[in-house]
Amino acid sequence: MALAVLRVLDPFPAETPPLAVLLPPGGPWPATGLGLVLALRPASESPAGPALLVAALEGPGSQNGQRGPGPPQLLVSRALLRLLALGPGARVRARPVRRPPALGWALLGSAPGPGPGPRVGPLLVRRGESLPVPGSRVLETRPALQGLLGPGTRLAVTELRGRAKLGPESTQHSRLPPPPVASSFAVSHAVRQLKGVLGGTGDALGVTRSCLRGLGLFQGEWVWVARVGEFPNTSQPHLAKVQLLEPRWDLSERLGPSSGQLGEPLADGLVFVPATLAFNLGCDPLEVGELRIQRYLEGSIIPEDRGSCSLMSGPPFARELHIEIVSSPHYSANGDYDHVLYRHFHTPRVVQEGDVLCVPTVGQVEILEGSPEKLPRWREVFFKVKKAVGEAPDGPASAFLADTTHTSLYMAGSALSRVPLLPSGRSTPWDSLSPPGLEALVNELCAILKPHLQPGGTLLTGTSCVLLQGPPGSGKTTAVTAACSRLGLHLLKVPCYSLCADSSGAVETKLQAAFSRARRCRPAVLLLTAIDLLGRDRDGLDEDARVVATLRHLLLDEDPVSNCPPLMVVATTSRAQDLPTDVHTAFPHELEVPVLSEEQRLSVLQALTAHLPLGQEVNLLQLARRCAGFVVGDLYALLTHTSRVACARIRASGLAGGLSEEDEGELCAAGFPLLAEDFGQALDQLQTAHSQAVGAPKIPSVSWHDVGGLQDVKKEILETIQLPLEHPELLSLGLRRSGLLLHGPPGTGKTLLAKAVATECSLTFLSVKGPELINMYVGQSEENVREVFARARAAAPCIIFFDELDSLAPSRGRSGDSGGVMDRVVSQLLAELDGLHSTQDVFVIGATNRPDLLDPALLRPGRFDKLVFVGASEDRASQLRVLSAITRKFKLEASVSLVNVLDRCPPQLTGADLYSLCSDAMTTALKRRVRDLEEGLEMGSSALLLTMEDLLQAAARLQPSVSEQELLRYKRIQRKFAAC
């Protein structure tokens, strides 16, 4: 992509679209009368992601053409500059787009009145953009966010109402003009108090234009900044420059579901404070708080070696600067950083005694050559200012400028110090101080670690060791990283699998080396991931006493009288029960990653999709409900799978031969949204894989249309489950039933009923067969029962369906096992059922053929207190409803009469019998189709039809699965329990 400079043409030609560019004569691109399409993006942005497609037309003559050497100039309107979030003279990267994507479908919004007129030729449009037709806007496009609207585009038109009628241009023109600023500088000496937030780049305070006018300051002016606290001398004032903060380029947001809105405006009452300045001020990075700002008036900078003179006040230059390198686990304190420091101080920097300086190392490979340790290059190196001496050693100045011309730099020794949080530049939600879904966990970690950093923290009793447990992918490492960033602590990550060795002595040596390395860069947190891997022998069966003793000694070994900053240890595990007892008891603090609620899953999805273009039909709230039981890593994997599905959909939407490499490149430049169907397909794939791996619950796809008859049973089930969900205020009155028992002959649809309830009520469904919970090992059967209810609580709202409940919970005292396993399982099941009253959104449905074999305690109020009999269909009307539900997805001939089919069937039929009838008829139809294909009587592409003859043959062979004597026995059981 070639570099180009944007130049505002004012006034812009009225006959030219406002979001087009004019090409100068003699430029690098052919300027023809028909024009071409250019892909533009700011020069500072990475080439990944979508670009802005604009129409490039032939510009005016040589009087407005390019003059002199340098990049070519593009003549643009102010509306295009606002969309790019750039100013006049900004540089962009531009490349011609040979084949812009053609839009297959577009949704247009039109104001009340006549709709859009006839189209004349292709038109380059973008989602959220106003059309040349008055009152019309592009609301949605397929398959790309930008492309050509032509004769082959299918259009859908809807009516715009309210503020949706206004495009971004009209909202800009509707603002009131800014007030005059000629007299606002009369109050420049006053002390102003603003609220600071962590943000901005470099070493300057970032403010908006209106805030800059309100402060009465100029761009680049020096100010004193101090933190406002409870005491007058809460923090030492620091010097900083004031810079105008411009909005950031993000085409995905500008072409996102907000339909052309330019994002949230910057708040005028806020000042954006860089991370290093906030750290030196002593501010909390999560909430910078109130700042006191005053203009610097102590002197003026008059450089002698330059032709111009600035009368703005500025700090003096330092004659000497003494610094110490801050010890860190990410770089060597003994390395040669002369070249890095020289390049950093080539630009004058503000220094004050006691400050921590951040020196970036990006693009500087010299530190790798001189590093005595084999460490990868870290993106920044920290130094602490020990002393700064001005030209007048006895002068009152406390802040200086340091550069390579006026200052002599001295570096000796190292220091132990906290360091500020710096943004990584990747702009991911996991790098924030409060990762979405993990805010409460990070707060708990900070509350445990912070007291040890306060003055006198070494006198606290107990060690600062924390055990963090949670399933894989739940965000344990992310939470620890965020807590360390918030507290300014060094973080040394050590995976415990790297500490494992063939002998106990080797493991002991590696452990001591890891702790020794962490102590050299205190205050620090040593993060031991998967600590359950330590303390076991090579077979993994017995404990390694030597390793356990060493690890316990290292965890508890703290010198209470040491003046050094503390070393804190955080260990993570997904199987806390596998930890040796001596290691487990060495952690006085134990935290568990909480299960993500629906609101937390929504916040994670919103953070992950913040910079992704989504289709208008994507409902993140509904998606969060379907992701019940997911951890943070699962939601991240969902977005990855969705992107792959979207790419596959785009490739499949091309011609028969597929999209060429050039077409794929142009489509990626235009950008394409993630649709609801992409999320649905990815979610199905992920849930299937997750369910097969760990038995996670999922929402079934069974509706009431799949259940024929049983109207009374449906009503009783919905009153038990749906009523508390729709009216939670009834729970305070005690009107709650958490258990429901379905009993009756086999094959009557008890399992199908439970699945249909889960689907209709949007509940996850966890099906448990009774015998699969029984285990030969002592205590494992009870653990399996507890695990089932734990998974259900994690996936709430959820239905636990116990099939064959009589095999899991028979009457106690009658089992034949010598160890009393079944009695303990029944007791554990009763305890879990009693604990459901504290969990509002977990319901239990049991199914059995023999309720008389169940333990009587299960049928008492508060447990399975609602018994519902699901019997066989005895009348033709109910049998017809069941048969119609089964055959609703079949292709039936017009001559098929289900009533006549039922007349040939036995009188007593269950749902399983009718399903067997349809399955037998389908098998007969398949045999007939194969025979006709072999004889050439029928084409294979035609649909398979069920004929009346197929159904009648199956009805003639049908035998009821439940005899009349068995049905009578089930009815006697029903009357027995109904009388209780």
UniProtKB/Swiss-Prot annotation:
Pfam families linked to this entry: AAA (PF00004), DPBB_PEX6 (PF25395), PEX6_vert_N (PF25394)
Location in or out of the cell: Cytoplasm, Cytosol; Peroxisome membrane; Cell projection, Cilium, Photoreceptor outer segment
Top-rank taxon, per record: Eukaryota
One record GO biological process: protein import into peroxisome matrix, translocation
EC supergroup of this enzyme: hydrolase
Function: Component of the PEX1-PEX6 AAA ATPase complex, a protein dislocase complex that mediates the ATP-dependent extraction of the PEX5 receptor from peroxisomal membranes, an essential step for PEX5 recycling. Specifically recognizes PEX5 monoubiquitinated at 'Cys-11', and pulls it out of the peroxisome lumen through the PEX2-PEX10-PEX12 retrotranslocation channel. Extraction by the PEX1-PEX6 AAA ATPase complex is accompanied by unfolding of the TPR repeats and release of bound cargo from PEX5.
Complex formation: Interacts with PEX1; forming the PEX1-PEX6 AAA ATPase complex, which is composed of a heterohexamer formed by a trimer of PEX1-PEX6 dimers. Interacts with PEX26; interaction is direct and promotes recruitment to peroxisomal membranes. Interacts with ZFAND6.
The protein's name in its UniProt record: Peroxisomal ATPase PEX6
Annotated source species: Cricetulus griseus
